[in-house]
Amino acid sequence: MPFITVGQENSTSIDLYYEDHGAGQPVVLIHGFPLSGHSWERQSAALLDAGYRVITYDRRGFGQSSQPTTGYDYDTFAADLNTVLETLDLQDAVLVGFSMGTGEVARYVSSYGTARIAKVAFLASLEPFLLKTDDNPDGAAPKEFFDGIVAAVKADRYAFYTGFFNDFYNLDENLGTRISEEAVRNSWNTAASGGFFAAAAAPTTWYTDFRADIPRIDVPALILHGTGDRTLPIENTARVFHKALPSAEYVEVEGAPHGLLWTHAEEVNTALLAFLAK
């Protein structure tokens, strides 16, 4: 299997599993919590059919990548992404992040610039700043909320994932219509296969402050979000994000949950392909 080494922990290397398919302009897809690069399958198929080269990789601690106990912060995640881009020598690339993966996109552009990057897309994003503070009243929740997530993951991450995916896909509305029990089970299995340390460390990165990163986005951008997102509510994320980045193309998918890559794949793919074609 293909791996890219991004670091070292004690006697073992930290390797990221990746897949690289197709030809044409490269599109790098960066997954969300607690999934893997395979969560992009409905977008990967559409992009390949449209003539793009599609690269997915599993973030450290997730999927088939190494499961280290270090490096769970967006500076390191962005450095890992930079290593992927440099190792594959990608040029004129499009970075597409989903949920937690949008943080890599913002921090990469802020830290490494856009010499290799043509466009960026933020799907169900966590920007600009999830933490509710005195100077950020639009934040989604106080730090205690995220501390509670960490505690629940440490207590029984498998039970946590079951509840998490209920709201991730809005199963009370979409199960049996827009998503099957089998697809939900696959998401749970993917989550369970990731590392225990990453599962608890990841939520502490969600309240990273990206407000200083946003002005450095100097390439065409897409912000796309579901109005029914219970995980990262649109009023705390995409709508505030768009005000901070008014040049971005902005799309709201009516009624879509956080996991809209699967439940509303047609709407997502239509908007993404139209953005890429411009």
From Swiss-Prot:
InterPro entries: AB_hydrolase, AB_hydrolase_1, AB_hydrolase_fold, Epox_hydrolase-like
One family name in Pfam for this protein: Abhydrolase_1
Single GO MF descriptor: chloride peroxidase activity
E.C. numbers: 1.11.1.-
The protein's enzyme class: oxidoreductase
The keyword Cytoplasm is assigned to this record: no
Keywords: Chloride, Oxidoreductase, Peroxidase
Domain of life: Bacteria
Domain AB hydrolase-1: 26-264
UniProt family annotation: Belongs to the AB hydrolase superfamily. Bacterial non-heme haloperoxidase / perhydrolase family.
Protein name (database record): Non-heme chloroperoxidase
Originating organism: Kitasatospora aureofaciens
Primary gene name: cpo
